[in-house]
Amino acid sequence: ARELHPENSIAVSENAHYTHERMGQVLDTEMVSLPTDARGRLHLDALEEALQHTPIGTVVLTAGTTGLGSVDPIADAIAICREYGARVHVDAAYGGFFRLLIHDDAPSFDGFPEEDFRAIKEADSVAIDPHKHGLQPYGCGCILFRDPTVGRFYQHDSPYTYFTSDDLHLGEISLECSRAGAAAGALWCTLRALPLEPTDGVGAIVGACLQAARTWADHIQDRDALTLLTPPETDIVAYMPTPDAPTLSAVDAASQSLFERAMNDPDDPVFTSLYRLPADALTTLCPQLQADQDEAAVLRSVLMKPEHKTYAGELVDRLATLAREETDA
């Protein structure tokens, strides 16, 4: 896109992975950050407005953000992008494997963004990364292009290689030039044992992880000391201690405190992570909050093991107890 239209920018949601901003700097291309809706997804009205008033060449949509696990409204967003002539890249690095759950034999999950996962096939390019749900180490990701001839824009020549074929070689179109085949071989072996099937292998695993996340979220909603930010669409759950005041500063302090107390408990530690959200995104998720600072931390749990469902109630109960102790102190 930069080679054909260097004046165009790239649009991403404010919850998109931080590496998109980094690549914008590498490409020396302006990045446009778009707001999100009450479910942490790219806001469609903001997307259309940006396309109307800003020269945007590419829109990045995310199938499972790493912060909230949210799936952008991919189907509707692609339709808007086609209307304005913008190409679409889908970042399916984290949530792409949840596409396996769209099958007659797969378990049914109410509210699962089925149409958005189906629409991934309509994108111009898709990033996939088996180092997460594909059970692989780093180095086993790739980008798939609908039109393979775009490889010519990435081509770089060498005076002593690439003479064996008229087709573009991977080394000619990648930044790394050469890549070890071990990661691809390891993925092949893994998928022989755990196939890409909806009720077996990887499909069964991601289905169990989604169920674990929903179970975790259900337990949060049953406890007054904790507040769920948005129902999980993948296996990531974002939540916060119910603050003693409806302000971002109170949420930030309570989240930091609960995170540290839970992790550092010598007898019964609970390991979570913190996720920092800008004020506009967090107040959109939780309209009852007042933005008295620019951002705030919330808690984030990733249920990437099917076994997590078994312990969800116990762990959430432990977090709720610690949160109540903080409030009562």
Task: List each language-model region with its residue ranges.
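Conserved alpha/beta core surface patches that mediate binding of polyanionic ligands
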Residues: 165-172, 215-221, 266-289
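Conserved PLP-binding catalytic core of the aspartate aminotransferase-like
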Residues: 227-278, 283
